[in-house]
Design a protein with these regions (language model features):
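STAS-like cytosolic regulatory interaction modules
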Residues: 1-89
Length: 89
């Protein structure tokens, strides 16, 4: 189960995510990110498990300027692999 804590300060919004993130959570994450913040930070320190759709979502977020902090190593490596596979197609 995903838990989201939202903190806003000035033009920055930080979403602290914890638990398991599934593809069914992506719409809620988009909704939480849809504000007037210039800078959005996703803090993944307490994320325990993700699926492939979430990895693609995180990659797209990062490509769009969202900052990923405390990204678990396995998630970072998976993002890199997904990008490499996407570049080959």
């Amino acid at each position: 189960m995903l838990r989201i804590e939202k903190e806003s300060a000035g033009h920055t919004t930080r979403l602290r995510l914890s638990g398991r993130i599934q593809s069914t959570d992506i719409d809620e994450l988009w909704a939480q990110m849809d504000d007037d913040a210039i800078r959005i930070i996703l803090d993944l320190d307490e994320v325990t498990l993700v699926d492939v759709e979430v990895v693609r979502f995180l990659s797209d977020c990062e490509d769009g300027g969202v900052v990923l902090v405390h990204c678990p190593l396995y998630v970072r490596e998976w993002i890199i692999r997904e990008r490499a596979e996407g570049a080959q197609t």
